[in-house]
């Protein structure tokens, strides 16, 4: 079988103007970026809000993944193609933009795989329409303005040692996690420690993905907490007057991007916060726009259902025009064997006992999603190494727990690799649902953390570090303890330790620190060892990437 990039490069895309027509976007409602991608204009966004009935919303999430991932984006794209091209229903796919750092690191890109991809994958995985570069510029401009304020005036007596904002770069670079700036004479600024986070982990990314228009964007930027004064008073961006300039840098990036799949299904790709350290969903503008343009919208939540899935249900959906109508949980045979602590070099070997043991992980994710009161189906992403005995056993286990289940092979067959699955998903969206959140908006921070830990992770106890206790007291002092919580946790385990696999229970969850993201409107609760600046592996994907003299790129995946 051809590589992902070979398949993508061999596909003839339609002009993006033709894709826009499929969802009733007019020529003057898109802004072209070449022949194959466009931004949807404010004129288009505002026009489609009027009158049309909202489409059905299908959320795709997954079990706890292996380090290689389980093909959630591939399933989202393939399922969208199947609903569109096999069932002939008006469909739109809404996905996150890939971060460039992991493309050159371990994970690779995020445009699907095989015959279920969004294109052009080189553009989307690298520079695309420039959104990530605009975000990086905005992040670092804000940091520079804050440092200049301290150097030039500092009438609010902002303490340079208590600045909470981080600089940003869309590259995996562990050397930038902690640095000292302003070294040398005072001519170079005020010396103090600083740090970088990868662009998608910055609060401005979360703000971009939650803002509903430019006024909301500007308001959220103004509400960002910069740090504290020497008198222990909070200082916000609006206190310094920088929100207008930063919003101007992001005004174009706020418009969603329109592309297509290999099978020419329209797709909106916009925003990309990580799910293990942020809320892990594409922009609210993208999903709401898709809901107004089509009858069926497929979107995904990052990592497993305990991370992106939980955050989508309890947080993201509060900002959307509607709740999900159905949830798809993606599972793979190999990941379940991994959850049974089978070593990675043996995952391709048939092992029914390991599959049965690892099923406990999938069982918990299914039941967690079902507790939200929305219909749930499991789609098994078929790998070449899966045996018929393993696939049959997994379907049997899922159905015995009361859930629908289908095996799909969108990667190898495109939309034809799961027509029955598409029919079942569409059928599920018509079932009645009774949405229930894990926690109430009026719950305290501690209550919200406790309910997620007990009901989703199945932890017994929660242990707060002294630092976390101090930060919680500080948040309460500022009157911000009514905000939603976003858990930052390893994606590989229900616990805060990535080595504890399966479906553990009655463990202690360790809360290391809390961070107020006032502009985004949530509190990040960090558990275990979570990094917002990844490093590169010993053998980075960059070593396999090349470009020929005609500009044709190879090695991306």
Swiss-Prot record:
Pfam families recorded: FTHFS (PF01268)
Descriptive protein name: Formate--tetrahydrofolate ligase
Entry's Gene Ontology BP terms: tetrahydrofolate interconversion
Record has Ligase as a keyword: yes
Domain of life of the organism encoding this protein: Bacteria
EC id: 6.3.4.3
GO MF terms, alphabetically ordered: ATP binding; formate-tetrahydrofolate ligase activity
InterPro entries: Formate_THF_ligase, Formate_THF_ligase_CS, P-loop_NTPase
Pathway: One-carbon metabolism; tetrahydrofolate interconversion
Alphabetized UniProt keyword annotations: ATP-binding, Ligase, Nucleotide-binding, One-carbon metabolism
Segment forming the signal sequence: none
SUPFAM superfamilies named in the record: P-loop containing nucleoside triphosphate hydrolases
Residues that bind ATP: 66-73
Similarity remark: Belongs to the formate--tetrahydrofolate ligase family.
Transmembrane segments: none
Reactions that this protein is recorded to catalyse: (6S)-5,6,7,8-tetrahydrofolate + formate + ATP = (6R)-10-formyltetrahydrofolate + ADP + phosphate
């Amino acid at each position: 079988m051809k590589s992902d990039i070979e398949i993508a490069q061999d596909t003839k895309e339609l002009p993006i103007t033709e894709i826009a027509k499929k969802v009733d976007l007019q020529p003057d409602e898109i802004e072209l970026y070449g022949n194959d991608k466009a931004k949807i204009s404010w004129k288009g966004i505002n026009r489609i809000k009027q009158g049309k009935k909202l489409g059905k919303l299908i959320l795709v999430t997954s079990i706890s993944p292996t380090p290689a991932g389980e093909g959630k984006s591939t399933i989202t794209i393939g399922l969208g193609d199947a609903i569109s091209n096999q069932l002939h229903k008006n469909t739109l796919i809404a996905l996150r933009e890939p971060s460039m750092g992991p493309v050159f690191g371990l994970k690779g890109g995020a445009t699907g795989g095989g015959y279920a991809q969004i294109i052009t994958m080189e553009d989307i995985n690298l520079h695309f329409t420039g959104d990530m570069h605009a975000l990086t510029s905005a992040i670092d401009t804000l940091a520079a303005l804050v440092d200049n304020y301290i150097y030039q005036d500092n009438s609010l007596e902002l303490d340079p040692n208590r600045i909470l904002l981080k600089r940003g770069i869309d590259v995996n670079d562990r050397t930038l996690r902690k640095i000292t700036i302003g070294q040398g004479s005072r001519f170079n600024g005020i010396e103090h420690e600083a740090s970088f986070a990868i662009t998608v982990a910055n609060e401005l990314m979360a703000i971009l993905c939650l803002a509903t228009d430019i006024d909301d964007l500007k308001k959220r930027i103004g509400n960002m907490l910069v740090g504290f004064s020497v008198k222990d008073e909070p200082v916000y961006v609006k206190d310094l007057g920088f929100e207008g300039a930063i919003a101007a840098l992001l005004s174009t990036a706020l418009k969603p991007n329109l592309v297509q799949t290999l099978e020419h299904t329209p797709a909106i790709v916009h925003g990309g916060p990580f799910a293990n350290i942020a809320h892990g969903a594409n922009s609210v503008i993208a999903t709401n726009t898709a809901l107004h343009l089509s009858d069926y919208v497929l979107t995904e939540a990052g990592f497993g259902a305990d991370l992106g899935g939980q955050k989508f249900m309890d947080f993201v959906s509060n900002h959307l025009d509607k709740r999900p109508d159905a949830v798809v949980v993606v599972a793979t045979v190999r990941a379940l064997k991994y959850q049974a602590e089978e070593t990675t070099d043996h995952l391709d070997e048939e092992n029914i006992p390991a599959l049965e043991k690892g099923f406990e992980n999938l069982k918990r994710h299914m039941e967690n999603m079902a507790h939200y009161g929305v219909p749930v189906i499991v789609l098994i992403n078929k790998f070449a190494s899966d045996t018929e005995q393993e696939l049959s056993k997994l379907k049997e286990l899922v159905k015995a727990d009361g859930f629908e289940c289908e095996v799909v092979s969108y990667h190898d067959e495109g939309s034809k690799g799961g027509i029955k699955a598409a029919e079942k998903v569409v059928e599920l969206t018509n079932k009645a649902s009774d949405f229930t959140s894990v926690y109430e908006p009026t719950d305290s921070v501690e209550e919200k953390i406790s309910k997620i830990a007990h009901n989703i992770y199945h932890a017994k106890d929660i242990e707060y570090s002294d630092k976390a206790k101090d930060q919680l007291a500080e948040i309460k002092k500022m009157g911000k303890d009514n905000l939603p919580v976003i858990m930052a946790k390893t994606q590989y385990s229900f616990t805060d330790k990535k080595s504890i696999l399966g479906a553990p229970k009655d463990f202690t969850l360790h809360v290391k620190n809390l961070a107020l993201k006032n502009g985004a409107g949530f509190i990040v609760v960090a558990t275990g060892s979570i990094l917002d600046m990844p490093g590169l592996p010993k053998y980075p994907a960059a070593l396999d990437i090349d470009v020929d003299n005609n500009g044709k790129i190879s090695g991306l995946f």
